[in-house]
Amino acid sequence: MSARGGPLARLEARITREWQRRGALAWALTPFACVFGLCAALRRTAYTQGWKQPVDVGVPVVVVGNVTVGGTGKTPTVIALVDALRAAGFTPGVVSRGYGANVQAPTAVTAASRASAAGDEPLLIARRTGAPVWVCPDRVAAAQALRAAHPEVDVIVSDDGLQHYRLARTVELVVFDHRLGGNGFLLPAGPLREPLSRHRDATLVNDPYSGALPPWPDTYALALTPGAAWHLDQPTLRRPLSQFANERVLAAAGIGAPERFFATLRAAGLAPATRALPDHYAFADNPFVDDAVDAILITEKDAVKLGASWRDARLWVVPVEAALDPRLIALVVEKLRGRSPA
């Protein structure tokens, strides 16, 4: 069975491939990358040199972000971090931009929210953690609104926002996948939003292929493990992935790095046909109606966008759990208890 994807998904895949090598296109775009890098450096310098002051929202902030474009595993990392902080005695809340949603003002996200109004990632975080989640393009405003509504919150986790320097932060965690920094060039010649040398408190690397870690200081492995699939229409109905081995399976993902999801399924012993959808795919209609398969495996991030009108009995959702290194958790807790936002 051949894999299909829309033009946008194919374009995203082409750009991603180009960003992994220093080909003619990358070199042709380096003048634009220099301009991008200068603008980014000036913006960061404005805060590091005191020309602009970051806003202290009154509690420590942990930023989980990346210096590259595309998915690296931030959302499961945020979920695992919220659980770890709660286990350490904190009362965490989460702020996010709400990418993909029409959000202009600080908005609370609950398990009953719609992805179109909250964003798929914040909605998934709210459902998985039960923590207070607020979204707004202005993360400072989101954090202030969260604190006003939930004064019991004593630490805020920012889902992405590494480059949102206006929000004062106590800890910065940068997440990479196996692609690391790609060709090492800044946008648009490469995938980097900032240089790889950018300071951070710790680096997490999610590499399902080799498991190797780069020789960077304070670097920890990030393991993402799939759980038993649950049925979209009957969430209490669960099946181990091994039970799909002898069925005709299509794996579909509208995430930043769909190939990583497909690799996870292959590592579990499946050989699915694959469908890469554009990141934050809206699922305005069912793209699977013509697929002659027994089961369709999708990500949790995609599942939150499928409402009650979806009645495709073939849809199964594969949850992913992030395992954080205990040393990383200890590092974060130590910094939260011993340092004020800066």
UniProtKB/Swiss-Prot annotation:
ATP binds at T68, V69, G70, G71, T72, G73, K74, T75. Pfam families: LpxK. It is an enzyme of class 2 (transferase). Disulfide bonds: none annotated. Pathway: Glycolipid biosynthesis; lipid IV(A) biosynthesis; lipid IV(A) from (3R)-3-hydroxytetradecanoyl-[acyl-carrier-protein] and UDP-N-acetyl-alpha-D-glucosamine: step 6/6. It catalyses: a lipid A disaccharide + ATP = a lipid IVA + ADP + H(+). GO terms for molecular function: ATP binding; tetraacyldisaccharide 4'-kinase activity. Its EC number is 2.7.1.130. Keywords: ATP-binding, Kinase, Lipid A biosynthesis, Lipid biosynthesis, Lipid metabolism, Nucleotide-binding, Transferase. Belongs to the LpxK family. This is Tetraacyldisaccharide 4'-kinase. It comes from Burkholderia vietnamiensis (strain G4 / LMG 22486) (Burkholderia cepacia (strain R1808)).
